[in-house]
Amino acid sequence: MAAVFHYGTDSLTVSDAMAIAGGACKGVISTDTAAVVKRSESAVESIVSSGKTVYGINTGFGILASTAISASDTATLQHKILQSHSVGVGQPLPVEVAKLMLITKAHSLAKGHSGIRLSTLERIVWHIDQEAIPVVPEKGSVGASGDLSPLSHLFLPLIGMGELWVPASNKQGYQRVAAMDYLKAQNIQPLSLGPKEGLALINGTQFILSFAVKAVQRLHNCLEAADIIGAMSLEALTGTKAPFDARLHALRPFAGNQLVAQRLRLLLQNSAIMNSHVDCDRVQDPYSLRCMPQVHGASRNSWLHLSELTQIELNAVTDNPVLLENGEAISGGNFHGQPLAIPLDYACVAAAELGNISDRRCYLLLEGKWGLPVLLMKDVGLNSGFMIPQYTTAALVTENKTLCFPASADSIPTSLGQEDHVSMGSISGRKLNQVIDNLEYILAIELLSAAQAIEFRRPLKSSVILEFAHSYIRDYVSFASEDRIFALDIEQVVSQLRSFQFVKQVGQFAKESGVSLNQGFEQFEL
């Protein structure tokens, strides 16, 4: 990954966007980008001076599109649209999501099809560099005509309104300040928006897109973790790796299935635990063990679909109207969020099912079968063992099921019927990340349970990779010989999942051991 990203000309990826948001990469405006932005700025000036009626430049918005606006009022119109459309409610977005909105919007505007002035684009990039991130309410977008309300809040600070998150004076987190106060402290004047700029700023899918970017990264991490954790559960339950045979999966060649089967084979190779029961009389394992390639693999296929479409949207122009290279303005529907809303809802089901099958493995670990003690503790009765953590997975799995209703299947007409079909993709994006929040906890509880269960297979050891995974978690959570506050253990483990460190460290160890878990399936890499 390059240390510098050129807005408008480089191809933006999920990793790039997250790197810019995290400060590992700097986004800049190149001379080529400046030229195309100035070209579209000139096109707007020509339209205004010609007196030609073009939506959003010298007309009202939505149902008011037929209302002409005089040339003297076009600038006022742009300020009014930011104020009138700032109607969001609810909690503020996480700072990282709001920052991603700025980054993805800057990249889209930098393509030179929106008619925005170079000075306005530069101010947006200044906010990113300064980490002066607008306060944006989480609710209020219907996902067409773009994410109007959240984007309006996002750009209020450009005109000296709204609020900002800025780095706290003690360097710990952010503090919330009035945008105008911050601009004054920086000796920066608010912008006076030109024709079309207000509409260009708030028309787009960057709210939906930013949640998609987060989800692509987070769900990928969960998918990688689920295979490792599932393999640990299989070992603890003395399951067989026979259902992961490559010849079997070649007969039903879904790429996700084949990848998961390969990963499980490699994770389990040369395991003394596995070799100890090769000749046992157990014919088949329960589905939650045997069908990991089919279930985890289906979720991977869904992730791949979302990842591919997110990549397209990251480099798309979702404004309306758009300005072509010849200065022609075309009014269309690139702002409609449906292309992301549907795959986000699809991924919601995929993430929920990953949690569903994980909960089933948690339950298997507690049953006291195949040589494991009931509830994974020897002195139960006095102790409840790992009984109650599975209550939490059951609750989270059920909550995820309620979040799987596809928001994109619903639509409520807005703007007096002019905008008569909307995507609700903003809800799809938010609830997918809620499902992933729950999924991370479910996987953390399975990892706790599997790590506990493997201890009862000693002195036999698992594969070198799974033993590393086990010892890694043991650095944070010890074996439980009696009851304790397991919520503290869960938080320790989930922090390792959410920081991506568990997957990163296990993957790095595998590579150092000469094992490439995803070889041949590079399309599933982030």
Where are these regions (language model features)?
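Glycine-rich, flexible loop motifs
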Residues: A2-G51, Q78-P137, V216, L234
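Polyanion/phosphate-binding surface patch
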Residues: K52, T67, V260
